Amino acid sequence: MGSEKQYIDLYGSGRDALFSHSAAALNAVRDKAFDDFRRLGFPTRKVEKYKYTDMDAIFSPDYGLNLNRLDIPVNPYDVFRCDVPNLSTSLYFVVNDAFYSRLMPKSTLPEGVYVGSLNAYAAENPGFIADYYARIARTDTDAVTALNTMLAQDGLLVHVPRNVKVERAIQVINILRADVDLMVNRRVLIVLDEGAEARLLFCDHTADERRFLATQVTEVYVGANASLELYCMEETHHLNSRVSNVYIEQQADSRVSHNVITLHNGVTRNSLELALCGKGAECDVNGFVIADKEQHVDNNTLIDNRVSHCTSHELYKYVLDGRSVGAFAGKVLVREGAQKTVSDEVNRNLCATKEARMYTQPMLEIYADDVKCSHGSTVGQLNDAALFYMRQRGIPVKEARLLLEFAFINEVVDKITLEPLRDRLHYLVEKRFRGELCKCQGCSMCK
C-alpha cells in the first residue's frame, strides 16, 4: 500500500467532521465509497487507463484539508474579473470546494432553474439528490471517484427543468485559495430535464502560489431532446495538480458539446466517460492543450454507444514546448445492437521541441456491423518547408513559428459556438504562444 494509507487514516479520523458538515444525501454513499477506495487503491502505471500519469506522485504529498469548513477569506471580485467582451453571463463562484453564496448575482435565470450549492440543495431535496448523485460516477470502478465521493462536502448543482431554455450562459469561476498547501475535493452535478437547453462555462484559476491538489467529479444528465454546451478552461499555476473525472449520460435526440481547454497548469489528468443511451443522441467532444516547461496534461476519453443511430465527433490537439508531456487515450465503444453508429476520433499533436513528449492511443472497439467509424492520430513538428517559405518572405523565425502554431490550434478553437468566447480564446491563445502567460497571474479573460 502506497499513498492510499494516509487517506484511509484521514477518513477514520475525519469521518465525524465529514458527516457533521454535510447533508445526509451526500453522507449516504460516503462509507461505501471509502470501502471501494480501500479495496481499489490508487491505480499504477501498469493499469492501461493510467499508464501515462503517476497517480501516486500526485496523491503522496501531505496536503491540508478543510473538513471542518473553516472560513477562507476571499473576495472573488478582488481576485478575478472574468469578462468575455460581448458575452452576457450569469456569474457564480466556487472557492476551493464550496459554493460562494455571498456573491449570488441577481437572478436572470428562468423560473425553476437552480444554480447553487450542492450541499444546501441536498439538505432540502434529498430525494432529487438520491436519484442522481453517485449514480453514473461509480465508486466501485475508479479509485479517484471513490476518494472524491468519500471526502466531498460541497460543490455545484445546476438543474434546468423540462423545456426551459437558459438564454444567458452560466459562468462558474473555480478559485483555489489557501495560505497552506491544500487538497480540494469538489463535486459538480448537472441535470437537464427533457427539452432543456443551457450553456455552461467553467474557469479554473489559482489565487495563491501554494501547492494545490484538486479532485473534481462531475455528473451530467441530459434528458431527451435536451441540449448542453459545456466549456471547461484551466489556467492554474505550475504547482497545481488537477484530477477531473466527468461522466455524461445522454438520452434520445439529445445534443452535447464538451470542450476542454488547458492554457496553463502543473499536472492535469482529465477523464471523460460519455454514454449515448438514447437513439439519435449526438455529441461533439473537443479539446486543446498548450503546454511548455515541464507541464503534464493527460486526457482520457470513452464514448460509449449503447444504442443505435447515435453520432459522435471527437477532436483533440496539443502543442507541446519545452520539456512538457502530453497524453491522449480515446476509446470509442460500439456495443452489440448499436447499428447505424457514426463516429470519428482524431488526435493531432505538435511537438515544438525535441524534448517534448506526446503519447497517443486512439481506439475503436466495435460489436456491430452496420457502422461508420474512424480514428487516427499524428505526432510531428513544425513544417520546415513552411518555415523556410515564410522566412524567405521576410517573416522572422519566431513570428513564423507562432503563426504556424496558431493555425494548427485554431481548428479546435473555431469549433466553439459561443462567438465572444471563441474570439477571446483566439486572443488568449496568441498571448500564450508569445509566452505572455508563463504563469498564472490572474484571470486571463481580463488581460
Sequence positions of predicted segments:
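N-terminal amphipathic, basic helical "cap/leader" segment at the start of enzyme domains
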Residues: 1-146, 315, 321
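Conserved beta-strand/loop scaffold segments within soluble protein domains that form the structured core
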Residues: 106, 111-114, 121-395, 409, ...
